[in-house]
């Protein structure tokens, strides 16, 4: 609505403003109610006490207008205060927001600057570190790889050698029992397992005393027994037992199961042991060992006429083809001859075979002599 052209001090203008403003209107209504109450109470008071009353309507209206203006100004000030507070509050929030935004922006800029500086100086430092810290270990690693390659070649060579040895062992395991036995027999035939000097060896001067030795068995049966081709009368002399050649048929045979042989030693010897050797059953032409000697007695002989000294009685087991017998009686004297007297064999009534006889002892007298156990002389 357009404003009226009334002056500010006009009471009508004030009333009009009061009509448009609700709060001054309420104040004016209160003023009217107060005037009415005064009018209502005035008759009662006039009834009791009659005083002179002066009505001033113009002053009352002016007061009401002033009160309405004050109320209006108060409301306007309150609204201005509220709006000012809101504006100030919003301004503070904006300031805080701007401050935080600036702080975060500064931090981001600082981080970006630091990263830029780090990226500029890092490559050179990384290069130096690689030169100092990586090249050394890399060189060591290359040397280690070369050593590993070298040792790998050696390992391959060793593995090849091991494979060859394994193949040979497998071949040896695949050999039959007969081959193993034959090899063992050949070793026993050609090898000397008695590591003692043999004073009955023909090659060093030992011989046979034929005067005190049994007659050699000479018969057609022996010829057919040992040789299939009958070209000559087959018989080996007694001194064959003084040679190391122990092969089937290369033995001295005497008739029956009783006989003797006297061996003249190469020199006088303090006797300690005697060894008998026979062929194994596996290579015997007859397939048996019935011609091997069984029970026998050993005598030491010295002087002329020769005196016999009993040295021991023994039994030969043909399963053990080489047997060494320690003498039961070892007198403290040296002997120049040894007699081996056989009293039985292992079942052959026709003849007995001796393959090899060895005599062991020492040239010097032994330090300690065992207790002598002399036996009566035997023919």
From Swiss-Prot:
Sperm (at protein level). Widely expressed. Conflictingly shown to be specifically expressed in testis. Residues 1-105 are nuclear. Residues 205-364 form the SUN domain. Residues 141-182 form a coiled coil. Pfam families: Sad1_UNC. Changing residue 162 to K: In SPGF16; uncertain significance; in mouse model increases interaction with DNAJB13; impaired localization to nuclear inner membrane. Residues 31-45 have a biased composition (Polar residues). It is found in: Nucleus inner membrane; Golgi apparatus. Keywords: Coiled coil, Differentiation, Disease variant, Glycoprotein, Golgi apparatus, Membrane, Nucleus, Spermatogenesis, Transmembrane, Transmembrane helix. It is a single-pass membrane protein. Changing residue 275 to M: In SPGF16; significant reduction in protein expression; impaired localization to nuclear inner membrane; in mouse model decreases interaction with DNAJB13. The keyword Cell membrane does not apply. Its main location: nucleus. It comes from the Eukaryota. This is SUN domain-containing protein 5. It comes from Homo sapiens (Human).
């Amino acid at each position: 609505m357009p404003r009226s052209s009334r002056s500010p001090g006009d009471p009508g203008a004030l009333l009009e403003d009061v009509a448009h403003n609700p709060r001054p209107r309420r104040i004016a209504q209160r003023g009217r109610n107060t005037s009415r109450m005064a009018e209502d109470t005035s008759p009662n008071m006039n009834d009791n006490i009659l005083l002179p009353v002066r009505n001033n309507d113009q002053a009352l209206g002016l007061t009401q207008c002033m009160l309405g203006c004050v109320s209006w100004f108060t409301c306007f000030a309150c609204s201005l205060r509220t709006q000012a507070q809101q504006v100030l509050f919003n301004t503070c929030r904006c300031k805080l927001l701007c401050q935080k935004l600036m702080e975060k922006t500064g931090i981001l800029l600082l981080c970006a600057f630091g990263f830029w500086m780090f990226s500029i100086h890092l490559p050179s430092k990384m290069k130096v570190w690689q030169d100092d810290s990586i090249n050394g270990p890399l060189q060591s690693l290359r040397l280690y790889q070369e050593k590993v390659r070298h040792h790998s070649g050696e390992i391959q060579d060793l593995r090849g050698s091991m494979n060859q040895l394994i193949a040979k062992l497998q071949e040896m395991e695949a050999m039959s029992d007969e081959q193993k036995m034959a090899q063992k027999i050949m070793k026993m035939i050609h090898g000397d397992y008695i590591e003692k000097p043999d004073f009955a060896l023909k090659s060093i001067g030992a011989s046979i005393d034929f005067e005190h030795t049994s007659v050699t068995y000479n018969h057609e049966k022996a010829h057919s027994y040992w040789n299939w081709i009958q070209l000559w009368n087959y018989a080996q002399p007694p001194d064959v037992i003084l040679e190391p050649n122990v092969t089937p048929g290369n033995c001295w045979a005497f008739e029956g199961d009783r006989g003797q042989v006297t061996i003249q030693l190469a020199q006088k010897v303090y006797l300690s042991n005697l060894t008998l050797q026979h062929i194994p059953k596996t290579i015997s032409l007859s397939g048996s060992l019935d011609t091997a000697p069984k029970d026998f007695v050993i005598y030491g002989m010295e002087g002329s006429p020769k005196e016999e000294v009993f040295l021991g009685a023994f039994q030969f087991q043909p399963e053990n083809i080489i047997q060494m017998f320690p003498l039961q009686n070892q007198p403290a004297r040296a002997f120049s001859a040894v007699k081996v007297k056989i009293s039985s064999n292992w079942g052959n009534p026709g003849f007995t075979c001796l393959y090899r006889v060895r005599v062991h002892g020492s040239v010097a007298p032994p330090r300690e002599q065992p207790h002598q156990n002399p036996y009566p002389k035997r023919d």
